[in-house]
UniProtKB/Swiss-Prot annotation:
It comes from Bacillus cytotoxicus (strain DSM 22905 / CIP 110041 / 391-98 / NVH 391-98). This is 3-dehydroquinate synthase. Its cofactor is Co(2+); Zn(2+); NAD(+). GO terms for cellular component: cytoplasm. The lineage of its organism: Bacteria, Bacillati, Bacillota, Bacilli, Bacillales. One of its GO terms (molecular function) is nucleotide binding. The gene is aroB. Pathway: Metabolic intermediate biosynthesis; chorismate biosynthesis; chorismate from D-erythrose 4-phosphate and phosphoenolpyruvate: step 2/7.
Amino acid sequence: MESIHIQTTSKKYDVYVGKHVLSSLTEVVQRMKPAVSNVMIISDESVATLHLQKVKEALQIKQDVFSFVIPSGEKEKSFENFYAVHTAALENKLDRNSLIIALGGGMIGDLAGFVAATFMRGIRFVQVPTTLLAHDSAVGGKVAINHPLGKNMIGAFHQPEAVLYHTPFLDSLPEKEWRSGFAEVIKHALIGDVELYHWLKNNVTTLADLRDDKLVYVLKRAIPVKAKIVAQDETEKGVRAHLNFGHTLGHALEKESGYGNITHGDGVAIGMLFAIFLSEQMYKIDLRYKELKQWFLQYGYPSIPRHLKVDRLVNVMKQDKKANAGTIRMVLMQEYGGVHVVSISDKTVHTSLEAFQKDMVLGEEMNFE
């Protein structure tokens, strides 16, 4: 079975991508040493309705298999759900040789992964992503839950035993989720695979093109970009911060819009455009910002919401995990495939963000006409 190999300081594992990888789930579980004592599948209501039974049927093992389904929505990564899953794990007598399977998108992967990282000080888990966005979050071992004051503020680094990307699970995604996930694909192309970036521009005219063999190809190109960075910096002490390209403003937009009102990918798309806009200004270079803006609008990515206040966005950006002593630090670009983290003054960010917001509104109006 063809796979993408992930090598980190703490673990080696494989990512399997394709139309039939679910049939390999039993083999993946049975290969684990020590032997798995029992299994708990964690999912949400939306995904469970569509796919939970398929996963149970694919898992042909003699050990007990339990499932725990949480309500769907933006509060999936809450402390309440985290506590509830731990309670279910204890009630079902999971132990240190148990296995958790995360069946769902990025939020389920994060929640289930953090449960695995903390239950009895750490047990094994497998990621079974069901969204395009999760091609990013399912790889690399960052797991977390949210706090009312910030996203992903309570978490750990806990690598999965394997990732099984059964692409037919993505068929049920609404268009906004395809768009959200595609933003992370674009991010990986821009920061680490320029050839993929050009391929996307030539071969993915609309989001409907991301199906079948093209989808598998895109995943097999995008995931290794992250894998290479994670291999160099598993716990985000250095170059792993490059994966936050577009996320400084993106996270601020999510928070100020109210979590759930703008998708993660839409926020990241706007954030990437701003990072390129700012990079052109700071380094006096041409990164083809206007061309990229039109390309993003072609896929339906939104402009920066007009009602959001620049002052408030800047303040939220100062709370970003990359910030240092209240100084904003962003991932900027000097060339495609070449990014780095830079400290930027509040004044520079404020001035550039005001100009960017005006330019995005103008671009939206011109595109509408």
